[in-house]
Amino acid sequence: MAIQHRDPRGGGGSRDARTNRRIKAREVRVIGAEGEQLGVLPIDQALARAQELGMDLVEVSPMAKPPVCKIMDYGRFKYLEKKKQNEAKKKQVVVQLKEVKLRPRTEEHDYDTKIKKVRAFLGEANKARITVMFRGREMSHRELGQKVLQRVIEDLRDVAVIESAPRMEGRQMFMILAPNPKMLQSQRDKAKAAAAAAPAAAPAAGAPAPTPAPAPAAPAPAPAAADPAAQR
């Protein structure tokens, strides 16, 4: 039985609900395994009910008077709760910060390639750090770095907003861009529209194929003309 084999200390840490012999109340209000109300029972009788079903008695509302307990398979309950938590974590969006490094005089092809990468990264709801690196005497021409960053802002205006304005840090000038909320909302709207349109476009599952229309009957052959020679 579940009660006989369960550690009386619970083994689940202080956050676990009290189960079985750990329940201290003398009387408890019991909810059955199917959600039915069993009323207020002495703790020994409630434990016996759970044991008959091979389940646990779990204190679900300890502050109630009397405490509310439910008969359930507590091990399975904990497993399902853990599974739900893991699935919720998978659905959480993890925002990453990708850095793209430029020079005050970056070649046009290199610039275009990196801007495309930043655009794609922002489209995935991530952030981007755009860094302009100065070398040697370039430090005396910081305005070139400002021009580069301003160009980036203009080129990505439709997909990005400035989260951290351009500033110097040592021999680098950088800014941080975040995804444009309007762009993200547009993506969500398009995804919803596509999902809604998909079932309508797909043929109904199991629907019989339409019966082809019968081919028109061939016309009857015309009677042969009488031979004049035969009539003589």
From Swiss-Prot:
Q: Which GO terms describe its molecular function?
A: ribosome binding; translation initiation factor activity
Output the InterPro entries linked to this UniProt entry. Answer: T_IF-3_C_sf (IPR036788), T_IF-3_N_sf (IPR036787), Translation_initiation_fac_3 (IPR001288), Translation_initiation_fac_3_C (IPR019815), Translation_initiation_fac_3_N (IPR019814)
The residue ranges flagged as biased composition, category Low complexity, are: 193-208, 223-232
Gene3D superfamilies per the record? Translation initiation factor 3 (IF-3), C-terminal domain (3.30.110.10), Translation initiation factor 3 (IF-3), N-terminal domain (3.10.20.80)
GO CC, alphabetical: cytosol; membrane
Source organism, top-level taxon: Bacteria
Q: Which HAMAP family match?
A: IF_3
Q: Where is this region: Disordered?
A: 1-21, 184-232
Query: Where is this chain's protein located in or outside the cell?
Result: Cytoplasm
Q: What is one GO biological process annotated to this record?
A: ribosome disassembly
Q: Which organism is it from?
A: Anaeromyxobacter sp. (strain K)
Q: Keyword check for Protein transport, yes or no.
A: no
Q: What does this protein do?
A: IF-3 binds to the 30S ribosomal subunit and shifts the equilibrium between 70S ribosomes and their 50S and 30S subunits in favor of the free subunits, thus enhancing the availability of 30S subunits on which protein synthesis initiation begins.
Q: Does the keyword Lyase apply?
A: no
Which Pfam families does this entry report, sorted A to Z?
Answer: IF3_C, IF3_N
> What family is this protein classified in?
Belongs to the IF-3 family.
* UniProt KW keywords: Cytoplasm, Initiation factor, Protein biosynthesis
Compositionally biased region (Pro residues): 209-222
Quaternary structure note: Monomer.
Tell me the gene name. infC
Task: Classify the main location.
Answer: cytoplasm
According to UniProt, the name of this protein is Translation initiation factor IF-3
